[in-house]
Amino acid sequence: MALPIILDCDPGHDDAIAIVLALASPELDVKAITSSAGNQTPDKTLRNVLRMLTLLKRSDIPVAGGAVKPLMRELIIADNVHGESGLDGPALPEPSFAPQNCTAVELMAKTLRESPQPVTLVATGPQTNVALLLNSHPELHAKIARIVIMGGAMGLGNWTPAAEFNIYVDPEAAEIVFQSGIPVLMAGLDVTHKAQIHTADIERFRAIGNPISTIVAELLDFFLEYHKDEKWGFTGAPLHDPCTIAWLLKAELFTTVERWVGVETQGKYTQGMTVVDYYFLTGNKPNATVMVDVDREGFVDLLAERLKFYG
């Protein structure tokens, strides 16, 4: 039986590729997709979800837009990474269908309520919508199998020296998620920075030769340009968000540890930092499964294999 998931995302090049991967995978049953503000403004990320589903001919999937700003802060966006549209690069279709006439939290709650089995939440942007769901619907916590997030880092940040972008945008929301008591899987920069897509990989995807693999290659062409900045020391572009979907499909590609994670909401230099108690110094019981390594070649092979689904 396929694993039911709700995808909460802020497309974003890597979010878009996570959508492509999820919908190419019969092991997953994507019940709904909700949009969060982060990589771009809320109107643009919602439009990008609709554009991707139009491209993939999946207007059957319910879509709803989420919170327009973080719980307690003003919105920060990453337009320097993802461009003016949030998905700069390829020519994508205009949306052929409209979102549901409800909020992301309402769509998530309805989906959980109606599902006969617990649902996995996959959140690849800021955690605002998930935190709002958890706070407003405590009665539905038991319907959530786990929360798989792309965010955080045990080590270095990518938006500040200490913080990864998604967590930095809404640290209060992330703290609610980590302390919810629901199993959390954290795909942080420690792993996603190893899940780099190189130029040769992009050409491999392009050579698959179907319309979707071509668009994925064009998304990656654009995404790679930003990551060529020497400060990162990258040889490719880190494909952050698809690590969440890849873990659901093939967990053996990843090395994980069980640890306690807290989110810094106050620090002068460290707001948005995920504090991972790697050496069990706090005495707190682990509340998260934390990714620490990935088989990069296996990850790329999985993407290439699933892109053939669209042939």
Swiss-Prot record:
One of its GO terms (molecular function) is purine nucleosidase activity. Gene3D superfamilies: Ribonucleoside hydrolase-like (3.90.245.10). It is an enzyme of class 3 (hydrolase). It holds the Pfam family IU_nuc_hydro. Keywords: Glycosidase, Hydrolase. Hydrolyzes cytidine or uridine to ribose and cytosine or uracil, respectively. This is Pyrimidine-specific ribonucleoside hydrolase RihA. The lineage of its organism: Bacteria, Pseudomonadati, Pseudomonadota, Gammaproteobacteria, Enterobacterales. The gene is rihA.
